[in-house]
A protein has these predicted regions:
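A short beta-loop-alpha structural element at the N-terminal edge
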Residues: 6-20
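Conserved acetyl-CoA-binding loop of GNAT-fold acetyltransferases
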Residues: 130-141
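A short, internal acetyl-CoA/4′-phosphopantetheine-binding micro-motif in the GNAT/acyltransferase core
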Residues: 62, 85-92, 119-121
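Conserved GNAT-fold acetyl-CoA-binding loop/helix
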Residues: 20-49
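Conserved beta-strand in the GNAT
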Residues: 60, 66-74, 81-86
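A short helix-loop-beta-strand connector motif used in the catalytic cores of GNAT acetyltransferases and
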Residues: 46-60, 81
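Conserved GNAT acetyl-CoA-binding A-motif
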Residues: 108-119
């Protein structure tokens, strides 16, 4: 039995590992949509460092010394926008993404009415993960490169 990952706030020193895991995790999405320019793949190390510095919250998941996942959340008014949920490909399907999602929601749940995120409309595994955690598709959009996106939301229980 493997111990659960340690979920903790990211530090500036984590930025390189976050970017490495993020790029590895999003490669399958790039292949699925034939788009090597997805924002998680083109983001720079300086941009990841800026994200870690705030005002958004960035959490990491570690198994021992290895960073195996991360997620970000940014609050705008009464909505918390979840983004860049990434898990190392060899660790996917083990509950790490769900743990990161629950942990990042808990950070801001007392301050917002709902969570919002988007994922590729054809990303069945991602959609299943989010739906298992209470998110529902509320619409569709396209990114600047024409990739079709599913927009999902989840109300915060007993708020608003």
């Amino acid at each position: 039995v493997t111990a659960p990952p340690l979920i903790a706030p990211a530090t500036p020193a984590d930025a390189g590992e976050i970017l490495t895991v993020q790029r590895a995790a999003y490669l399958t999405e790039a292949q699925r949509y034939a788009d090597p320019f997805l924002p998680p793949l083109t983001e720079t190390l300086d941009e990841v460092r800026a994200a870690v510095a705030g005002p958004q919250t960035v959490l990491t998941a570690r198994l021992g010394n290895r960073l195996v996942g991360s997620v970000r959340i940014r609050v705008e008014g009464d909505i918390a926008h979840v983004g860049r949920l990434s898990v190392a490909p060899d660790q996917q399907g083990r509950g790490i993404g769900g743990r990161l999602l629950r942990a990042v929601e808990a950070v801001v749940a007392a301050r917002v009415c709902r969570f919002a995120l988007f994922t590729g409309a054809d990303s069945a595994d991602n959609l299943r993960l989010y739906q298992r955690h209470g998110y529902r598709v509320v619409g569709h959009d396209s990114d600047p490169n024409g990739v079709r996106l599913a927009l999902l939301e989840k109300p915060v229980p007993l708020r608003c």
